[in-house]
Amino acid sequence: MKVKGMIESDVDTFKVGDVIEVKLADGVKVQAMAVQQEEDGMIFCLVDCLPSEHPMNSTSTNEGGYEESSLRKKLNGEILNLFSAELKAMMAPFNNGDLLRLPTEKEIFGQNYYGECESLCVKQWKPMKKRRNRMAFDGTKYENFQWYWLANKVEDSAFRFVSVNAGGNADYYNVTNSIGIRPTFKIKNH
Protein backbone atom coordinates (compact mmCIF):
# COMPACT_ATOMS: atom_id res chain seq x y z
CA MET A 1 0.00 0.00 0.00
CA LYS A 2 1.25 3.48 -0.87
CA VAL A 3 0.48 6.47 1.30
CA LYS A 4 0.79 9.98 -0.01
CA GLY A 5 1.45 12.56 2.70
CA MET A 6 2.19 16.22 3.06
CA ILE A 7 5.23 17.43 4.93
CA GLU A 8 5.45 20.97 6.24
CA SER A 9 8.94 22.44 6.51
CA ASP A 10 10.92 25.67 6.26
CA VAL A 11 12.90 25.93 3.04
CA ASP A 12 15.13 28.43 1.28
CA THR A 13 14.75 26.90 -2.18
CA PHE A 14 11.80 25.54 -4.10
CA LYS A 15 11.34 23.02 -6.87
CA VAL A 16 8.67 22.94 -9.57
CA GLY A 17 5.52 21.39 -8.14
CA ASP A 18 6.05 22.65 -4.57
CA VAL A 19 2.94 24.27 -3.08
CA ILE A 20 3.04 27.07 -0.51
CA GLU A 21 0.16 28.47 1.51
CA VAL A 22 -0.32 32.23 1.73
CA LYS A 23 -2.68 34.08 4.07
CA LEU A 24 -3.97 37.30 2.54
CA ALA A 25 -4.78 40.49 4.46
CA ASP A 26 -8.52 39.80 4.10
CA GLY A 27 -8.08 36.47 5.91
CA VAL A 28 -8.38 34.32 2.78
CA LYS A 29 -5.86 31.47 2.57
CA VAL A 30 -4.61 30.58 -0.90
CA GLN A 31 -2.14 28.06 -2.24
CA ALA A 32 0.45 28.81 -4.90
CA MET A 33 2.35 26.21 -6.93
CA ALA A 34 5.96 26.59 -8.09
CA VAL A 35 5.68 26.39 -11.88
CA GLN A 36 9.00 27.56 -13.36
CA GLN A 37 12.53 28.25 -12.19
CA GLU A 38 14.11 31.38 -13.64
CA GLU A 39 17.57 32.83 -13.14
CA ASP A 40 16.43 35.27 -10.46
CA GLY A 41 13.71 33.21 -8.77
CA MET A 42 10.88 30.68 -8.83
CA ILE A 43 7.58 31.60 -10.49
CA PHE A 44 4.46 30.66 -8.51
CA CYS A 45 0.88 30.61 -9.77
CA LEU A 46 -2.16 30.41 -7.51
CA VAL A 47 -3.62 26.90 -7.53
CA ASP A 48 -7.16 28.31 -7.55
CA CYS A 49 -8.71 31.67 -8.36
CA LEU A 50 -9.09 34.43 -5.81
CA PRO A 51 -12.68 34.52 -4.47
CA SER A 52 -13.64 37.72 -6.31
CA GLU A 53 -14.15 37.98 -10.07
CA HIS A 54 -12.81 40.87 -12.15
CA PRO A 55 -13.24 42.31 -15.65
CA MET A 56 -10.12 42.81 -17.76
CA ASN A 57 -11.28 46.35 -18.63
CA SER A 58 -14.23 48.56 -17.72
CA THR A 59 -14.78 49.54 -21.37
CA SER A 60 -15.27 47.09 -24.23
CA THR A 61 -11.77 47.23 -25.73
CA ASN A 62 -8.57 45.21 -25.60
CA GLU A 63 -6.55 48.07 -27.10
CA GLY A 64 -3.12 48.22 -25.48
CA GLY A 65 -3.33 44.56 -24.47
CA TYR A 66 -2.65 43.37 -20.95
CA GLU A 67 -0.04 46.10 -20.36
CA GLU A 68 -2.73 48.82 -20.66
CA SER A 69 -5.55 46.88 -18.96
CA SER A 70 -7.46 47.94 -15.85
CA LEU A 71 -6.87 44.48 -14.37
CA ARG A 72 -3.08 44.87 -14.54
CA LYS A 73 -3.36 48.10 -12.53
CA LYS A 74 -5.68 46.42 -10.01
CA LEU A 75 -3.35 43.41 -9.65
CA ASN A 76 -0.38 45.61 -8.79
CA GLY A 77 -2.37 47.89 -6.49
CA GLU A 78 -5.42 46.64 -4.62
CA ILE A 79 -4.69 42.91 -5.05
CA LEU A 80 -0.94 43.18 -4.34
CA ASN A 81 -1.85 44.97 -1.10
CA LEU A 82 -3.59 41.78 0.07
CA PHE A 83 -0.19 40.04 0.21
CA SER A 84 1.88 40.34 3.38
CA ALA A 85 4.83 42.72 3.58
CA GLU A 86 7.03 39.69 4.31
CA LEU A 87 6.02 37.94 1.07
CA LYS A 88 6.24 41.15 -0.98
CA ALA A 89 9.82 41.62 0.28
CA MET A 90 10.65 38.15 -1.08
CA MET A 91 9.17 38.85 -4.53
CA ALA A 92 11.28 39.59 -7.58
CA PRO A 93 9.73 41.86 -10.22
CA PHE A 94 8.94 40.51 -13.67
CA ASN A 95 10.57 42.14 -16.73
CA ASN A 96 7.93 44.90 -16.82
CA GLY A 97 8.51 45.75 -13.13
CA ASP A 98 5.24 44.19 -11.87
CA LEU A 99 5.21 41.97 -8.78
CA LEU A 100 1.96 40.26 -9.80
CA ARG A 101 0.80 39.31 -13.27
CA LEU A 102 -1.51 36.92 -15.07
CA PRO A 103 -0.22 33.75 -16.72
CA THR A 104 -0.02 33.74 -20.53
CA GLU A 105 -1.75 31.38 -22.93
CA LYS A 106 1.53 29.72 -23.91
CA GLU A 107 2.60 29.23 -20.27
CA ILE A 108 -0.67 27.40 -19.61
CA PHE A 109 -1.19 25.54 -22.92
CA GLY A 110 2.22 25.45 -24.63
CA GLN A 111 0.87 27.29 -27.69
CA ASN A 112 -1.35 30.16 -28.72
CA TYR A 113 -4.80 28.98 -29.77
CA TYR A 114 -6.56 32.35 -29.71
CA GLY A 115 -4.02 34.94 -28.59
CA GLU A 116 -1.32 36.74 -30.48
CA CYS A 117 1.84 34.66 -30.89
CA GLU A 118 4.26 34.73 -27.98
CA SER A 119 8.05 34.47 -28.11
CA LEU A 120 9.67 31.11 -28.82
CA CYS A 121 11.37 31.55 -25.43
CA VAL A 122 8.01 31.18 -23.63
CA LYS A 123 7.35 27.53 -22.76
CA GLN A 124 4.46 25.71 -21.14
CA TRP A 125 4.89 25.40 -17.39
CA LYS A 126 5.53 21.75 -16.60
CA PRO A 127 2.63 21.37 -14.10
CA MET A 128 0.21 22.74 -16.73
CA LYS A 129 0.78 19.71 -18.94
CA LYS A 130 -1.83 18.08 -16.67
CA ARG A 131 -5.31 19.39 -17.43
CA ARG A 132 -6.25 19.30 -13.74
CA ASN A 133 -3.55 21.90 -12.99
CA ARG A 134 -5.05 24.17 -15.68
CA MET A 135 -8.45 23.94 -13.98
CA ALA A 136 -9.12 26.16 -10.97
CA PHE A 137 -11.79 26.40 -8.31
CA ASP A 138 -13.51 29.74 -7.74
CA GLY A 139 -11.87 30.39 -4.36
CA THR A 140 -15.17 30.28 -2.47
CA LYS A 141 -16.59 27.72 -0.07
CA TYR A 142 -18.72 26.37 -2.95
CA GLU A 143 -15.65 25.14 -4.87
CA ASN A 144 -17.09 25.53 -8.36
CA PHE A 145 -14.69 25.28 -11.27
CA GLN A 146 -13.98 28.80 -12.54
CA TRP A 147 -13.13 30.49 -15.82
CA TYR A 148 -10.08 32.75 -15.44
CA TRP A 149 -8.19 35.40 -17.40
CA LEU A 150 -4.89 35.03 -19.23
CA ALA A 151 -2.69 37.95 -20.30
CA ASN A 152 -3.23 37.60 -24.06
CA LYS A 153 -5.67 39.62 -26.10
CA VAL A 154 -7.47 37.58 -28.76
CA GLU A 155 -5.99 37.98 -32.22
CA ASP A 156 -8.37 39.72 -34.66
CA SER A 157 -10.73 40.85 -31.88
CA ALA A 158 -11.19 44.35 -30.50
CA PHE A 159 -12.85 43.31 -27.23
CA ARG A 160 -11.76 39.83 -26.13
CA PHE A 161 -8.98 38.31 -24.07
CA VAL A 162 -7.91 34.68 -23.83
CA SER A 163 -9.21 32.76 -20.84
CA VAL A 164 -9.25 29.23 -19.45
CA ASN A 165 -12.70 27.69 -19.19
CA ALA A 166 -13.97 25.57 -16.30
CA GLY A 167 -12.80 22.40 -18.05
CA GLY A 168 -9.19 23.62 -18.28
CA ASN A 169 -9.34 24.39 -22.01
CA ALA A 170 -8.34 27.52 -23.94
CA ASP A 171 -11.21 29.91 -24.58
CA TYR A 172 -11.88 33.67 -24.72
CA TYR A 173 -14.16 36.18 -23.04
CA ASN A 174 -15.40 39.75 -23.49
CA VAL A 175 -13.14 42.14 -21.53
CA THR A 176 -16.00 43.72 -19.58
CA ASN A 177 -17.21 40.39 -18.16
CA SER A 178 -15.99 39.42 -14.70
CA ILE A 179 -14.25 36.06 -14.29
CA GLY A 180 -11.57 34.64 -12.01
CA ILE A 181 -7.88 35.41 -11.73
CA ARG A 182 -4.90 33.26 -10.76
CA PRO A 183 -2.17 35.78 -9.92
CA THR A 184 1.41 34.79 -10.62
CA PHE A 185 4.45 36.04 -8.71
CA LYS A 186 8.17 35.29 -8.46
CA ILE A 187 10.07 34.56 -5.24
CA LYS A 188 13.74 35.60 -5.32
CA ASN A 189 16.49 33.01 -5.13
CA HIS A 190 18.40 33.03 -1.84
Give a label for each model feature.
Residues 1-190:
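Collagenous Gly-X-Y triple-helix signature in extracellular proteins
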